[in-house]
Regions:
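C-terminal nucleotide
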Residues: 3-70, 95-130, 227-386, 398-436
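Alpha/beta catalytic cores of group-transfer enzymes, especially the acyltransferase/condensing modules
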Residues: 188-237, 241, 346, 372-375, ...
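Glycine- and acidic-rich phosphate- and metal-coordinating loops
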Residues: 141-164
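Phosphate-handling active-site elements
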Residues: 146-154, 182-196, 402-415
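DPxDG-like acidic metal-binding loop motif
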Residues: 89-91, 168-188, 397-400
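Structural signature of FAD isoalloxazine-binding scaffolds in flavoprotein oxidoreductases
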Residues: 82-102, 222
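Beta-strand segments within the central parallel beta-sheet cores of soluble alpha/beta enzyme folds
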Residues: 107-109, 153-160, 190-202, 340-345, ...
Length: 436
């Protein structure tokens, strides 16, 4: 992954780093990142994080790292079927203040959570840690160690504005951040972004116990707008797409519907399970290996064999996988109207066929559906909206024409509360050492 151009050799103590930040020494370096938002326009966030680190772990040499949230733009639930996706890292992020220690112990304090301590000679999976932050940390450390990367003890204080369970992939952000810290502290910041992403997915699947594709981690680790083809999942094809949304007069908005993904792992997990059932009918492992014409030829049999929902979800996959290619071509051609039309089609397909807008047995709580309805009314011809990420709860995505952003934000916050509509930028960088 990329290193900061402004990086200087030699770690600074917390006290020295705070003084440098307050003096403005790092202002130009920070401004050079396209992703710096209001969180960084004040130096308070970084200084507060450094102060919290020193309060918990003591005064010692430290560095600052960052990993972004991500927004999937196209390819809703295609990655776990070895399909294609279009995703972007966004200007919400998690930052870590981290410093090396001599003992083989990793201690991580996330703001608002309990301190996690993991010994580096005890990296085997612990079943009781499934679904926990500690499980994710242990998984990332184990995965990197298994691949032969240098490992050592460190302390880290983490603060994040990537909402948990919100469809911005807070878990992938966290995994990327831990991998980036290990890379920076012990491996000369030379662990490839793709390796950090694959290790994060390993941690999530094996140690955390949640089935997921690789899209979230790839978008967080690599950064920018990325087109990823997972046909060969061990060596995914990754291409950065140069798309200037600001120049096109479009703004990415993420609306937090205040419904969390927490407790919805089963609903989320059923999607790959059902898609793989359809693939298994053809003797294949995933839908990417199945010919679409063969699928449609067997439709009546598949409906009886796997049920209508599984078939509808496969219908979504085939159309969505092709749609990603069309979206990429539209962006390359600068055809923004075509791109927006395809984004809307993606959302419609997720709603009708993938069926990940609400939980079928919970008719009382359908906040994503409400958000989409309110969005369509508020936007009219001034933008498009869709469910993104895992779905079922959390957030929706909207691409809004610049002149309509304030009205859209007001309309959404009238329903979901103050600060529920996040106006974002696409961040150029993935996991990165900011100061070190």
């Amino acid at each position: 992954h990329e290193k900061t151009a402004e990086m200087e050799k030699g770690m600074r103590t917390g006290k020295k780093l705070t003084a440098e930040i307050l003096s403005g020494k790092w202002d130009e370096a920070l401004k050079s990142f396209i992703w710096i938002t209001q969180r960084y326009s004040s130096r308070k966030t970084l200084c507060k994080a450094v102060a919290s680190y020193c309060e918990i772990f003591g005064e010692m040499p430290v560095e600052i790292y960052s990993a972004p949230g991500r927004s999937e733009v196209g390819g809703n639930h295609t990655d776990h079927q070895h399909g294609r996706v279009l995703a972007a890292s966004v200007s919400l992020d998690a930052i870590a203040v981290a410093g090396r220690v001599d003992e083989p112990l990793v201690r991580i304090q996330s703001e608002g959570y309990k301190l996690c301590e993991i010994r580096l000679d005890e990296l085997d999976k612990k079943t009781r840690e499934e679904g926990t932050t500690k499980g994710l940390i242990r998984g990332v450390l184990a995965g990197l160690k298994q691949q032969g990367y240098k490992m050592g003890g460190f302390c880290a204080y983490i603060t994040s504005d990537v909402l948990s369970g919100s469809g911005l992939s807070s878990s992938a952000t966290f995994e990327t951040l831990i991998g980036t810290v290990v890379s920076g502290l012990y491996n000369h910041a030379e662990i490839p972004a793709v390796t950090i992403a694959q290790t994060g997915r390993y941690a999530e699947n094996v140690y955390f116990g949640k089935p997921s594709g690789l899209m979230d981690q790839m978008a967080c680790a690599i950064g920018g707008m990325v087109y990823i083809d997972f046909e060969n999942e061990e060596k995914p094809q990754v291409e950065k797409i140069d798309a200037d949304f600001e120049k096109a007069g479009l703004t990415l908005c993420i609306v937090d519907t205040k419904g969390s993904h927490a407790g919805l792992t089963h609903e989320y997990a059923q999607i790959p399970v059902e898609m793989k059932q359809i693939a298994a009918h053809f003797g294949k492992n995933v839908l990417r290996e199945v010919e679409e014409k063969d699928f449609y030829a067997e439709l009546p049999v598949l409906c009886k064999e796997s049920g209508d929902r599984a078939v509808l979800r496969a219908i979504h996959f085939f159309a969505e996988d092709e749609r990603v290619v069309k979206e990429v071509n539209a962006l390359r051609a600068g055809d923004w109207n075509r791109f927006l039309k395809l984004v809307k089609e993606s959302g419609d397909s997720s709603y009708k066929y993938l069926q990940n807008v609400y939980v079928s047995h919970d008719t009382v709580s359908e906040p994503v559906a409400i958000a989409l309805a309110v969005s369509e009314r508020a936007l009219a011809d001034k933008g498009v909206c869709r469910v993104h990420g895992g779905g079922f709860a959390g957030t929706i995505q909207a691409f809004v024409k610049e002149a309509a952003v304030l009205d859209y934000k007001n309309a959404m916050e009238a329903v979901f509360g103050a600060d529920s509509c996040h106006v974002l930028k696409i961040r150029r960088y993935g996991g990165i050492r900011v100061i070190g």
